[in-house]
Structures are given as structure tokens and as C-alpha cells.
Amino acid sequence: NMTPGEMADRSQYVMAAWKYLQDAAAEIGNPGLRAAVLDIMKNPAPLLAEGDAKAIMAELKGQGLLAQDAKAVFPTCASTKKSPQPFYTAPGSGWNSHHIYPGGLVTHTALNVASCKALYDNYADMFGLKLDRDVVLASQLLHGLHKPWVFQWQADGTCRKEEPLAATGEHHVLSIAESLRRGLSPELCVAQACAHD
């Protein structure tokens, strides 16, 4: 039996999508933002989990953003400095959703990045609209940055079940919170949030 990592490594589609994403990140003009995005893609570690989880959980429960019976606010992780799995091995979502296979996150994200690049170009060509291309690229590249944490592969071949947080899937909130924690711009974080419902 192959591990999820071995499956992703052997998939020409996953590896092509992973290279496409790295190349897209290299197109970001702002050197600081480019370095931050590439660093996150290399190791999407949950730095935000370094906070006081009990206090965060109490605050979220108090505001009705976390179920009162929730036992934790964060998925488990052996280290806040190292992602539980590489970005390119994570699924795109959980069971009964989309891209639920090793490497699904990168194929899903590659399609979104290609689509946003085309949309950016089309608006510029048709209407002369000049958006911040760096924000467009970075927000799409990072929109699911904590799927490797949330959708960890389990020993039985399934992935961890996503829990609700703030009336949506926890990867949405945790990914945006991570960008804020890492000091990325408010414009980027808003664009990243707009990549979700």
C-alpha cells in the first residue's frame, strides 16, 4: 500500500499542479509577499496554534462562533512549527466534497489560480481595470493554506473530519487567521476570505 505522500509523488497531475503553483508564487512582484507565500507553501505550519487555546475557545464559544460542546478549537498537531503534512499531499476537501485524494489541494488550487489569472487579464483587457496582481495571486495560492492541518490523513486512509467554526468549515477561518498571524496585509486577507463563501 502506498502512503498519501507516495500517491501524490507518483501522480503526474499532482506534480504538474504543484510546479504550476510554485511558478505562480514566483510571479508575485513584491519580494516580501513572494517570500511569505513560498514559505507557507513549503511549510504551512499552524503558527496561530501557539496562542492560548483555552482562552481562544472560551472567546469563540462566548460569541457563538464555536459549538458549546466543542472539546478543542484547533486540530491536533505535533508541532506548531511544522505542518502535519506537506501542502502538496493534502486533499482539496473532506469526504463527500471536492478533490478528496492525495494532492487534491494542489490540483484544486492550480485550477483556481489559472482561473483568477485569466479573470484578472480579462478585466484588464475589457475594462482597463488594474487590480493588485500580487494580491490576486497570493490570495488564491493561500485560500486553503490550512487544509494540510485540517484534513490530515488518518491511518485507515481517510482524512480528518472538518469541524465547524464561525458557521463555516474550520479551514476557512484558520487559513485567514494564519495569514493575519503572519502579518499579511488586510487587503490580501480580505481577498483570501472572498475565495470562500
Annotate each predicted stretch with a short phrase.
Residues 48-108, 156-161:
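Active-site flanking loop/helix segments enriched in acidic
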